[in-house]
Amino acid sequence: MNKELFYSELSKDLKKKFGTSVEKALPWQLHESLSATVMELIDSDWENSRKAHLDSRRACYLSMEFLMGRAVYNNLLCLGITDEVDELLKAHGRSLNDLEEIEDAALGNGGLGRLAACFLDSAAAHDLPLDGYGIRYKYGLFKQKIVDGFQKEEADNWTKYGDPWSKRCENDKVVVKYGDQTVYAVPYDMPVIGFGTKNVGTLRLWQAESVEDFDFAQFDCGNYDGAVKAKNDAENISKVLYPNDNCEEGKILRLKQEYFFSSASVTDILKKHLAKFGTLDNLGDYITIQLNDTHPVIAVPELIRQLCAEHSYDFDKAFEIAHKVFNYTNHTIMAEALEKWDCRLVEKVVPEVYTYILMINERFIKDMYALKKDREYISKLSPVGDGMVKMAFMAIYVSSYINGVAAIHTDILKKGALKDWYELYPERFQNKTNGITQRRWLALCNPELSALITKLLGNADWVKNLDELKKLEKYADDEAVLNEFMAVKEAQKNRLAAFVKEHDGVDIDPNTIFDIQIKRLHEYKRQFLNALSILYIYYGIKDGSIKDFTPTTFIFGAKSAPGYRRAKAIIKLIGEISKLVNADPDTKDLIKVVFVQNYNVSYAEKLVTAADVSEQISTAGTEASGTGNMKLMLNGAVTLGTYDGANVEIVQEAGEENNYIFGARVEELAEIMPKYDPREILFSNDKIKRVLDKLIDGSLSDGGVPSNEEGSFKELYKALTDGASWHVPDHYYVLGDLESYVQAKLKVNADYKDKLAFAKKCWLNIANAGKFSSDRTIKDYAENIWKIEPCLLYTSPSPRDRQKYRMPSSA
């Protein structure tokens, strides 16, 4: 990189846009101009990559979420210019640390969106023609504040200072039609820079805009709200991720969102293909579309509709093309997450598409009759039935391939939730265990550990081939290396402690065990179990039954969906437990409970590097995969978890002896749950009863609800004893696993006393994390589902002098 030229361009941009200099610019101004300078640097490579992708068979990844995280640091890393840019800024009294408070792009919520981001990163790094399609949310999910222990949601206006990593592509805007309105979908393109290559992928995000911004006739008549109604109604479609669907209006808006980006993406794909080839007959030869969960499944009938209604194909030919093009990733076995839409609602919102959904269903029925299936079988599997459109079933019927995201998850799908479909189309089912990008989740977020690994291996090849970490196993008994690793971990714990103090105003002791659970708040992820276990340990310390407890800081980070009452009650419960144990003189030096606010990618980057213990405690058989477990493993935490999701493969790779597995397994739960009565545990185990009683005896405040009403903690209690919603009592086996979980927690606590032996366990987890790179996952998709190959034409040395595997220093 020519530093003088880079600085000149940066200075010019600051002067032109803001009338300021590098020395005087506000952080957001510096970020804006630095981004613009980098965008100029990659411009020719990005354009060449677009052309190369269009010349190749390419994959299009449709996802409701893309949780990209902060772009600036990752892009500098991938370009290999982090140190040079930081040195340049420091020469003028600034540094890259000045950009620490730049907002994350609020384009997702949890693992689904982060997985999509990792996939784009891996594809770009390995020259694979993969591009993403999603929604450019104005406010994302929400910004979380904890007020008096309660989650409060605020609008997350992440673009208030601009969005310098996006380009608005006005010429590519398309029209999306609903039953009651027509809107524009305007694309904003974000570059996905490949590490150590010239390849730059594209994430195309659609923003909803009104066809008519302002109705002057309405304004002239004094109807001022009516004058901007069309504009507001259109913009609402892309304002918020996952609008609350507890009401009819919320359901309509969510369906409109799903159709909005699915329709716009299909239109864009067809338009580009036609421009290149002049025909859609060969669409399946050049395009493959991956549906990330059920949200974009409406793209299936939409593609068929466009082929028939706008390009004159007959239905059967359009169906054949759709079958060649689409593939579907299933992310859950939970019935409530396998989307179903009321037929009445679908017909109302997208009447033209609904017609083709019915045609798909009719074809399915004919196919099944041809296979001599009976009515009961057909009714059970039909994409439309019981007044509902079953999105997962429609995806499975039309797609070429269906995949689960961890070995145990795929096995459960085949034997349980999708057993009939697997028996019908066994050749379509595959497993693709999820992965994470080591570039963001090690090279970027943990430069000290990265430097140690690179020193020991003699090179940084691991940044693009994580299997190289296996060579670290030989150092597992090297006391000097383990001491270096422990020093790195200590530095990261100090860094996190400083950030938590600044961000949340809470003091935490870096000399304690950092036991961390960070993930979306949901009952199946069992933050509730973790909270109850802390109470169990607290009372055990108080009564002397638990002795010699190693001081531990229990850290939670999670957001609850705004309308999810019990999840929000769990957040409040964690806060109340925190108040209790943190203030008690008997325990305050042994236990600290912290709930960090507004957990996001940037916060996660600090948490995963500092963790000693990774909490992965979902009920066996409910977590499809999980990726937080992989990030924490890669940074040297042991897994305390159930035999669920990717935990299974983590212990297979790193050894169960180097992790802590507890609780009932899938096959055991299949036998236990039909006759399970949690009250038997409650009334036979005094220690568990003591903990549960605190939810209803007034010891913990759930917000001062009058005694004649049912408070939120009592609702949590009754969910365990009597059941809640459509669930049986203790549906997620919290009480059933509690004793086993506490004992596993205490085993971790005792083992930590031998620091060197514990460090060895952590080190062996790092050394065996190679399988969990998203590079491996994406290559598997490319070879076995998408049938795409690297665009090797554009991997020659770059004119922008990118230095291969140039890692930032750990200073």
Model-derived features with residue positions:
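Hydrophobic alpha-helical segments, chiefly the membrane-spanning helices
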Residues: Y805-A811
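Conserved small/polar residues in nucleotide/adenosyl-binding loops
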Residues: Y794-D801
